[in-house]
Curated annotation (Swiss-Prot):
Coiled coil: none
Pfam families: NKAIN
Signal peptide: none
TM stretches of this protein: 2-22, 35-55, 62-82, 147-167
Compartment(s) of residence: Cell membrane
Subunit structure: Interacts with atp1b1 C-terminus.
One Gene Ontology term, aspect cellular component: plasma membrane
Gene responsible for this protein: nkain1
UniProt protein name: Sodium/potassium-transporting ATPase subunit beta-1-interacting protein 1
Entry keyword annotation includes Nucleotide-binding: no
Native organism: Xenopus tropicalis
Membrane topology: Multi-pass membrane protein
Family from the record: Belongs to the NKAIN family.
Entry-listed glycosylation sites: 100
Keyword entries, A-Z: Cell membrane, Glycoprotein, Membrane, Transmembrane, Transmembrane helix
Lineage start: Eukaryota, Metazoa, Chordata, Craniata, Vertebrata
Length: 207
């Protein structure tokens, strides 16, 4: 019963991770954030692998899923520090997130709740200047929205990591018990004795 509840909980967590990752992938596509797009794609693939491992009793899949979740937590912690400008990440924002291939930033920069976008009037701006509009009136600035999204990913990943370790341990314990039972049966098995095809007959001595 405990194993079943653990498996069901892990599948539920994986489904929540898929939903959150797909939602994030859509907004990253809209903002042309290529580095997060690649990371989200890998995350979706590994989460699907974790679901398959849970449903088909594959402990190795769950171990791989657990390792990826540790990397995923580190990546999202980096994104939180990045958007909250911890250290010198803000100096290379465009280069890191979109590989410096476009003039876009986060989709939430211009489409956040309550944001009012005003085009910049005046002489043409150089291509290196990405500030083509002014954004005012946002109820929540886009760095905080991105940080909250990453915090949600970390929250789900931590729960997934704990349950994946638990379920994979249950699977490995069951595999070990099956191997032990199989080896015990092999020792207890006795091969049938071969019967001789020679037939003994009484020898009569002539009188």
């Amino acid at each position: 019963m405990g194993r079943c509840s653990g498996r069901c909980t892990l599948v539920g967590i994986c489904c929540l991770q898929l939903a959150a990752a797909l939602q994030r992938q859509i907004f990253d596509f809209l903002g042309y954030q290529w580095a997060p797009i690649l990371a989200n794609f890998l995350h979706i693939m590994v989460v699907i692998l974790g679901i398959l491992g849970t449903l088909h009793y594959r402990s190795r899949y769950l171990i791989l899923y657990s390792i990826w979740l540790a990397l995923w937590v580190a990546w999202n912690a980096f994104i939180i520090c990045f958007y909250l400008e911890v250290g010198h990440f803000s100096q290379h924002r465009d280069l890191i997130m979109n590989f410096n291939t476009s003039m876009h930033r986060s989709w939430w920069m211009e489409n956040g709740p309550g944001c009012l976008v005003t085009p910049v009037r005046g002489p043409p701006l150089p291509l290196a200047d990405h500030h083509m509009v002014t954004v005012t009136g946002c109820l929540l600035d886009y760095p905080y929205i991105e940080a909250l999204s990453s915090a949600l990913q970390i929250f789900l990943a931590l729960f997934g990591f704990v349950y994946a370790c638990y379920v994979s341990k249950v699977f490995m314990d069951e595999e070990d018990s099956f191997d032990f039972i199989g080896s015990y049966d092999s020792y207890g098995y006795q091969a049938p004795m071969k019967t001789s095809h020679l037939q003994l007959q009484p020898l009569y001595k002539p009188g």
